[in-house]
């Protein structure tokens, strides 16, 4: 399983997803758009994310990419089935 995190603003939410991905055995996280990464643009650790991730940011493989669509296309070409989740007033 691979997860794509698209434009998630909160360091705390991303840190929590790293923890969940670690527990679920997720092979990789793609961090897209404005989604914060464990290492910031200056090469420094993201302390707010790391505080919530509890070390999972060091064990879960991740890649920061600008284009969510490019990541999706790459995964489709590799044979992955794409499933999307979104919060919406009309969501089931």
Residue ranges and their predicted role:
Residues 1-87:
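RNA substrate-binding interface of SAM-dependent RNA methyltransferases
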């Amino acid at each position: 399983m691979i997860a794509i995190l698209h434009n998630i603003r909160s360091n705390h939410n991303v840190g929590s997803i790293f923890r969940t991905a670690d527990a679920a055995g997720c092979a990789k996280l793609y961090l897209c758009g404005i989604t914060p990464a464990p290492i910031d643009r200056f090469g420094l650790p993201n302390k707010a994310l790391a505080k919530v991730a509890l070390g999972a940011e060091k064990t879960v493989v991740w890649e920061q990419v600008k284009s969510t669509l490019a990541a999706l296309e790459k995964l489709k070409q590799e044979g992955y089935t794409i499933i999307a989740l979104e919060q919406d007033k009309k969501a089931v």
